[in-house]
């Protein structure tokens, strides 16, 4: 059963009033593929708009905090930790990993996914003038801890211990 639908099939925000407050964490990722020259410009600090990784990191953090404003049925959450890590992968990609934590009554998967997605979109925005062929791919949940549904880890996920 989809939890965001009532008995008549109408969308509603899930009532979490009676759920226990537990520690919750989620990790998500996104990959941005680009021309090798674009990645070289980013990692060398030669982008005329500034530090692409720093701007994307801040954008991801802001996005996690704004998730309930962007996704209609998400609860507003008091996140206690948001981390966004960006790293060059090979000679033509940036891997973004975002993690969110809180003690609360609902999970933080959407916040982690939103952080990774917006960080990827920010890279695209900052670099589109030099590389319109960039591709954002593999936006996915890597790991989820806490809550009633327990621990989830993607089959091929490589998550830090």
From Swiss-Prot:
It catalyses: (8S)-3',8-cyclo-7,8-dihydroguanosine 5'-triphosphate = cyclic pyranopterin phosphate + diphosphate. Substrate binds at residues 73-75, 110-111. Pathway: Cofactor biosynthesis; molybdopterin biosynthesis. Homohexamer; trimer of dimers. Belongs to the MoaC family. This is Cyclic pyranopterin monophosphate synthase. PANTHER family: CYCLIC PYRANOPTERIN MONOPHOSPHATE SYNTHASE, MOLYBDOPTERIN COFACTOR SYNTHESIS PROTEIN A. One of its GO terms (biological process) is Mo-molybdopterin cofactor biosynthetic process. The gene is moaC. Its EC number is 4.6.1.17. Catalyzes the conversion of (8S)-3',8-cyclo-7,8-dihydroguanosine 5'-triphosphate to cyclic pyranopterin monophosphate (cPMP). InterPro entries: MoaC, MoaC_bact/euk, MoaC_sf, MoCo_biosynth_MoaA/MoaC, Mopterin_CF_biosynth-C_dom. GO terms for molecular function: cyclic pyranopterin monophosphate synthase activity. Disulfide bonds: none annotated. It comes from the Bacteria. It comes from Pseudomonas syringae pv. tomato (strain ATCC BAA-871 / DC3000). The lineage of its organism: Bacteria, Pseudomonadati, Pseudomonadota, Gammaproteobacteria, Pseudomonadales. The active site is at residue 125. Keywords: Lyase, Molybdenum cofactor biosynthesis.
């Amino acid at each position: 059963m989809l939890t965001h639908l009532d008995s008549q099939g109408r969308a509603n925000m899930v009532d979490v009033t009676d759920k226990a407050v537990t520690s919750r964490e989620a990790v998500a990722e996104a990959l941005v593929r680009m021309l090798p020259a674009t990645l070289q410009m980013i990692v060398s600090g030669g982008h005329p708009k500034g530090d692409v990784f720093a701007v994307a990191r801040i954008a991801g953090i802001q996005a996690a905090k704004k998730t309930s404003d962007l996704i209609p049925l998400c609860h507003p959450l008091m996140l206690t930790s948001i981390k966004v890590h960006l790293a060059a992968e090979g000679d033509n990609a940036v891997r973004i990993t975002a993690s969110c934590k809180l003690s609360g009554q609902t999970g933080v998967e959407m916040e982690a996914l939103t952080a990774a997605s917006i960080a990827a979109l920010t890279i695209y925005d900052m670099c589109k003038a030099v590389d319109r062929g960039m591709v954002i791919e593999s936006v996915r949940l890597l790991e989820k801890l806490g809550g009633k549904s327990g621990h989830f880890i993607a089959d091929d996920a490589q998550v830090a211990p």
